[in-house]
Amino acid sequence: MGQYNFDQILDRTHTKSLKYDFAVKRGKPADVLPFWVADMDFEIPPELKQILLDRVNHGVFGYTESDDEYFEVLQNWFSTRFNWTPDRKWLVKTPGIVFALAMAVRAFTNEGEGVLINQPVYYPFSMVIDDNDRRLINVPLIKGEEMYTIDFEGIERAIVEENVTLFLLCNPHNPVGHVWTEDELKRLGDICIKHNVLIVSDEIHADFVWKGHTHKVFADLGESYAEHCIVCTAPSKTFNIAGLQVSNIFIPNDSLRRRFIKEIDRAGYSQLNTMGIVGCEGAYKVGGPWLDELKEYIQDNIQFTIDYVAKYMPKIHVYRPEGTYLMWLDCSKLPLTPKERDEWIINEAKLWLDTGSMFGVDGEDFERINVACPRKVLEEGLEAWRRAYETKGF
């Protein structure tokens, strides 16, 4: 038994929780069990909770800014956890990574230019491209039996043929769970440098990389790679504080950083909220032991899910994630269309998952499930799915 209790089940309803309180408004039955959005059902580290409470008890919430300690805590985290020591001048703070992606698209591309992604991929990647009137250039990942790989030749061909100027990379990859190796990242980087394509690397899930795999920060590949990239990080997934709206973006190239900041200024954004600053600094300062225990718990949940689905729902294939607490389930052997499958899961299993089509056409045969929850909640969800599976006679 560890220091922290991850078996505790918290009632998150009536807290204005996006995950729990908005099913009906999003067209779902009121009684679905949510395993969709990527936030966890665990209370934040108690040490961090106390830091936030102390700040609330102060009672004044005027304009707040980060100081030297904020950056030093960040730097220590990345140095200790990833053997990467960023320079302070590289840091640009934003209220979220999706906001940062949108700012990058606007700062470094023109309307009509191509922005490259690898679907299936986190759906806001597509949104920030489409909403800013850029051309979405998709080079799908190559689906393997146990994991996906990158179509390097397809990427280079698309860059040349489609006038691509920006590449949005997801590492660790959401939803397929692949942690790109150093060799893969360098090969991607070499292609992009050759054709003067800027890489924006979303590394929000970097703290959830599982045994046998290592996360490599893109900017740590070497100086030439660092000069051609933007690295997006945040404490939100790691410590379950997405609602505090804080991200840390690292841009080693001075010219790129100035252009990025100018685009943020044009959008009218100026500074983080008070609790975001306090929460981010506090999380990276005191949250390490909590995270280490949490990762063990989630890895057990991942193994439980793999074993359970293989035993009771064998027509569904689970991809073992190398990173993230999200699992990618191949439902292509079920005799259902994607629409029929989604309706079956929602209305009969009473589960709210992220349907694979949200991640692009290449995800239509899949469902994504979030297993960052107490074991009993996970068991309840999988048992409900099993009953619906058996009722269908699969």
Residue ranges of each PLM-predicted region?
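PLP-dependent class I/II
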Residues: 4, 27-33, 38-53, 85-87, ...
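Short regulatory "switch" loops immediately downstream of catalytic or recognition motifs
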Residues: 16-23, 140-143
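Conserved PLP-binding active-site segment in aminotransferase class I/II-type PLP enzymes
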Residues: 1-19, 28-31
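Conserved N-terminal alpha-helix of the aminotransferase class I/II PLP-enzyme fold
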Residues: 55, 62-95
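Short acidic, glycine/Ser/Thr-rich loop/turn "cap" segments at secondary-structure junctions
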Residues: 57-60, 104
